Amino acid sequence: MSLLIRKEVIDMADSKAEYPAPDCLAPAAIEAKTEAAGVTKANLPVAKAFVLAMFAGAFIAFGGLFFTVFLSDSTLGWGAQRVVGGLCFCLGLVLVLVCGAELFTGNSLMVCALKSKKITLAQMLKAWLVVWLGNFVGALFIVFLVYMAGIYKLNGEAVANSMVSVAAGKVTVDWVMIFFRGILCNIFVCLAVWIGTAGKTVVDKVVGILLPIAAFVACGFE
């Protein structure tokens, strides 16, 4: 009898206990936040969306630059080199999420808002087109700045060789392989954005982004 009474007291204490709030959003809350973001993106004025997309293209270019500079003089083994290079590339998506820029790959999550019928297919496709073009222009602008700054001459032009090697590796692969590598890449980018959305602080977002982005770069996705 005393054991039963003791158990009831413990159960009552547990029911009244205050448990700490979770340090990240639950999956359902992430989806709701992603849907709301999709609606916002679909209704952005074209000029604003384009400028934000240019910033995203520039940020990803910064990540790519960091990646190629690292590769130009790495004495690590192939696997370790890819993983550390992937961590360098994370800079791009971290800047995109923290600064609120518009990235085409991350904006694929707008399908959540489309699924809930909060936006139309035409709105989504229009947003994707504007953002893709903005990303392209922003990346080209950074290419121009990097060229004019002579970054490619660093380390006895080893950085230039690294850039050419990375680019050549992308254009010499069969298009079918590139297509499916692109799908795999986008899965990992969307996972990184999803995890970043779950975070409540900048540190949460940065840590959440690291593994998915490092993984897709290390695995050679495009």
Model-found features: residue ranges?
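Alpha-helical transmembrane segments and their helix-helix packing motifs
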Residues: 5, 9-222
